[in-house]
């Protein structure tokens, strides 16, 4: 049988066709526009997502036996606000995860309602990207549009609705709305009241691997597929990507070294730290996960190489780095402020510890180590909750550097596994479709059978000890400079 994974991203929808053994048969990508109607705003037209997804599916299955397509599922950009009226028409363009218009509403939630209350209701605090502040913004700034709202949904769920007619979402994606009681897996009555919405306006909740419906007859006819093709709920992009890397089960970890950096830790038990330093969300395997987000990860190295050293020879610049764990230079990786664990938009990147004999290689090494130390900050929060973590998967552009992987393995004292294929949320979506269609009994079984580890970087005991001492020094730098950062414009 064949399964389709739909990765609804910010710049394009990426569609993946997978067979029952996990083999990738074809990948198609279709772009759409991103709109910035005012400084700091970021919007897209849900109709564009749908039209491009339909075109993408047609191209994806153009050369296969269409009778073999059994299911479709999703991994999608999180937090975006999609609103429909009583006629199922889109009321206004979707307000996306990276839209910054809701700082006033975010401050209201965190300071007036209070972070403790928000954590009690949802296991999280408010961020400008989350969905609930967007709803409050609509109520205040577009009351006519707000009063038209019949359905509130997330980006990938708009596709599921168009394909199946089922008004649905999954727990992992709903966790990022600030409307879900993450621990008890239900909509929070308190948050609905705060936002002025009813449960009837919110989608029905499903596990990521559950079937929400089948293709509508007219859609099936247009695509040339059976109307028995199952639509599976899918997951938010980070949870779907975690499925695609096999990060399911207790204490499993994945580090993504992209422009931003994430550390994703799956757990069979619910946990939330007292400072809400990590996001506490439901996971696509039916359990939970913690996630730390660094706003600048591989982008730190790109900035250092491109803007300061004026070179594209990234690998060559790392060749002279040999004295791991002995660097006297430290780098705080806060080029865009920081999310986890400090939640400080005013934090700034900093070099400290240079002297007259500091070399180019030591500065480059400090950048790589600073990102690793920043990831370790989030790891320590998870460990403080009693989660035992011994190894991690790694993906993203920065993971192509052997040196960076070695540094991370020793800074974090984790075995670092490199996987065979890295296709992110689309592959995770296809895996969820296979589980939903009964190809596998569980997400865990699918991950165990389909995700292949091709290399492991082992930590070295001597280097681990050296980096432990360096990390303890690193931890003292941000608190010492926090007050200074607050004075910067």
Language model features with spans:
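N-terminal glycine/serine-rich phosphate-binding loop of ATP-dependent small-molecule kinases
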Residues: 1-92, 120, 148, 220-221, ...
């Amino acid at each position: 049988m064949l399964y389709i994974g739909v990765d609804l991203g910010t710049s394009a929808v990426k569609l993946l066709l997978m067979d029952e053994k996990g083999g990738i048969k074809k990948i198609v990508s279709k772009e759409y526009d991103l709109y910035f109607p005012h400084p700091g705003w970021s919007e897209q037209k849900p109709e564009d997502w749908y039209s491009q997804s339909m075109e993408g599916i047609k191209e994806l299955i153009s050369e296969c036996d269409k009778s073999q397509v059994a299911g479709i599922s999703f991994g999608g950009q999180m937090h975006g606000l999609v609103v429909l009226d009583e006629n199922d028409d889109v009321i206004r363009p979707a307000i996306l995860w990276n839209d910054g218009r809701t700082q006033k509403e975010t401050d209201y939630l965190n300071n007036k309602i209070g972070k403790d209350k928000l954590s009690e209701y949802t296991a999280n605090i408010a961020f400008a990207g989350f969905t609930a502040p967007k709803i409050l913004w609509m109520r205040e700034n577009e009351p006519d549009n707000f009063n038209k709202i019949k359905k509130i949904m997330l980006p990938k769920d708009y596709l599921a609705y168009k394909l199946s007619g089922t008004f649905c979402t999954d727990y992992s994606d709903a966790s990022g709305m600030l409307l879900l009681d993450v621990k008890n897996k239900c909509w929070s009555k308190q948050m609905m009241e705060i936002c002025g919405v009813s449960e009837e306006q919110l989608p029905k909740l499903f596990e990521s691997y559950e079937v929400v419906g089948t293709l509508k007859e007219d859609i099936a006819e247009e695509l040339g597929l059976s109307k028995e093709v199952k639509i599976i709920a899918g997951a938010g992009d980070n949870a779907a990507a975690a499925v695609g890397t096999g990060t399911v089960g207790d204490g499993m970890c994945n580090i993504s070294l992209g422009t931003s950096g994430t550390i994703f830790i799956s757990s069979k038990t619910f946990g939330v730290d007292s400072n809400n330093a990590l996001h506490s969300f439901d996971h696509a395997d039916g359990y939970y996960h913690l996630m730390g987000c660094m706003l600048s990860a591989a982008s730190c190295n790109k900035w250092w190489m491109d803007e300061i050293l004026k070179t594209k020879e990234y690998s060559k610049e790392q060749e002279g780095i040999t004295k791991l764990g002995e660097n006297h230079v430290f780098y705080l990786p806060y080029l865009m402020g920081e999310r986890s664990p400090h939640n400080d938009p005013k934090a700034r990147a900093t070099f400290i510890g240079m002297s007259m004999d500091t070399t180019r290689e030591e500065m480059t090494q400090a950048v790589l180590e600073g990102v690793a130390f920043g990831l370790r900050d989030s790891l320590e929060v998870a460990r403080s909750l009693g989660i035992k973590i011994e190894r991690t998967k790694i993906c993203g552009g920065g993971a192509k550097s052997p040196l960076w992987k070695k540094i991370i393995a020793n800074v974090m004292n984790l075995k670092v596994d490199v996987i065979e294929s890295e296709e992110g949320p689309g592959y995770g979506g296809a895996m969820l479709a296979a589980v939903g269609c009964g190809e596998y009994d569980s997400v865990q079984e699918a991950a165990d059978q389909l995700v292949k580890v091709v290399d492991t970087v082992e930590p070295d005991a001597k280097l681990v000890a050296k980096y432990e001492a360096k990390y303890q020094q690193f931890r003292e730098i941000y608190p010492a400079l926090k007050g200074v950062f607050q004075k910067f414009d």
